[in-house]
């Protein structure tokens, strides 16, 4: 009688011998043609963000650092980390263990693109050192360029098609969950608040 490891190997070998016909990706031209578009993508993004509990702040390249300071100062003197704007004298987690993220009060970084229809912001590992920081911080601050806001998820995925990041996630609003009684709880599984800084010009 064959032992378990031998039986396992035999099964895997048999599976590898099977040649399945290659399936082509389904065409999604029809979906793209019917995808929603907005006359004002930035305005729609703001409405979507506020509807899911986020706050939106506008600034230009001249006062972006001041806006970051104002937003972070609202949450007191807690530890802020990995703020992707030069000129802020905050602590940085870049050389620390991911476990240190449990101490975060405010965590700020930049998003690559935003989506108007659902206020989702794409954050990749290019902008963060420890991905767990996005979930463990009490308050999350994300910066997005107004020109990087697209209409819908179809356009967002098209822009991400050729990007090869090891990790990335769409974030929309603060953490939210609801039980069977439909009691909404904010911040149970992630950040309690989300502030979005939209840079224009």
Put a short name on every predicted segment.
Residues 1-201:
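The feature marks the mature, well-folded catalytic cores of soluble enzymes
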């Amino acid at each position: 009688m064959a032992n378990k490891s031998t039986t396992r190997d035999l099964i895997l070998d048999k599976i590898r011998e099977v040649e399945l016909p290659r399936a082509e990706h389904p065409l999604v031209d029809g979906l793209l043609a019917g995808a929603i578009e907005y006359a004002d993508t930035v305005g729609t993004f703001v409405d979507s963000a506020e509807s899911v509990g986020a706050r939106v702040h506008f600034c230009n390249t001249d006062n972006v650092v001041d806006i970051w300071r104002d937003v972070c100062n609202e949450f007191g003197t807690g530890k802020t980390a990995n703020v992707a704007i030069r000129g802020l004298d905050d602590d940085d987690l870049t050389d620390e263990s991911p476990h240190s993220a449990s101490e975060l009060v405010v965590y700020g970084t930049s998003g690559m693109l935003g989506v108007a229809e659902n206020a989702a912001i794409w954050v990749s590992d290019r902008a963060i050192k420890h991905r767990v920081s996005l979930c463990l911080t009490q308050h999350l601050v994300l910066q997005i360029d107004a020109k990087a806001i697209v209409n819908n998820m179809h356009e967002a995925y098209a822009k991400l098609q050729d990007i090869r990041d090891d990790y990335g996630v769409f974030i929309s609003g603060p953490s939210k969950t609801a039980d069977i009684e439909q009691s909404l709880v904010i911040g149970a599984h992630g950040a309690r608040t989300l502030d979005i800084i939209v840079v224009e010009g």
